[in-house]
């Protein structure tokens, strides 16, 4: 198998969607599966690398085939968002689609907004929204709320690597934030408003980057379907290794590759400690963890 698939190969790699507002992440995955069928390509496993709220637009990495084994690493990566905090009303969902729960006539100045941002940079404790996909005793929090239950969501420590004010008007402020996994932008917006002694909600949310994947690499669903109908879906595919740009490649011999494919440890490896991508020529063999001079398989690939 080569790294560049032919028009009839099963797809193994990443398609980066520019998800539109109003579409759920699961719906987006279903659309990719439909595109694969339209293109007449072999059926493969498909999954996304990080839920994006229906309200939000932007970068949604979709893993195909063997790349689904790496989706968990995409979930753990940092994300970059642009979001608008509309002042005046807080909602139960913390976005524009929810019911108003609190209101205030107070509007902060630009200077006041900028003065509180330092409070949210670095590691902070955050309470996720009750309208979220977080599981509580096996059931999503949002489903429990809709069923009429009173829900308490536990707080968590997250990291805001960067937070800047991008635009401001008397009724709203737009920010750019680079955040760690597990961060809820809706909660961040709520907390910024509270720090300013007012109320607010997210009126706009766009993911600009997810791990190594950027908006420049993302395509719309319309473009995806167009390429599928033209039999050119493979041209939209990024290689499996594109999701691991911060993980070094480790060249292995054919004998070593065979051992790794059988799940065996390699002894006497000269490589950086930590995660490495074992490669036989141009073919991904396994994601391995190196400790000392020993390597063990974390994820093996069937190529």
From Swiss-Prot:
Protein name as annotated: tRNA pseudouridine synthase B
Active site per UniProt: 53
tRNA processing listed as a keyword: yes
InterPro entries: PsdUridine_synth_cat_dom_sf, PsdUridine_synth_N, tRNA_psdUridine_synth_TruB, TruB_C
Organism: Zymomonas mobilis subsp. mobilis (strain ATCC 31821 / ZM4 / CP4)
Function: Responsible for synthesis of pseudouridine from uracil-55 in the psi GC loop of transfer RNAs.
One Gene Ontology molecular-function label: RNA binding
Keyword Phosphoprotein: no
Catalytic activities: uridine(55) in tRNA = pseudouridine(55) in tRNA
Family statement drawn from the similarity comment of this UniProt entry: Belongs to the pseudouridine synthase TruB family. Type 1 subfamily.
Key words of the record: Isomerase, tRNA processing
E.C. number: 5.4.99.25
Origin: domain of life: Bacteria
One biological process term in Gene Ontology: mRNA pseudouridine synthesis
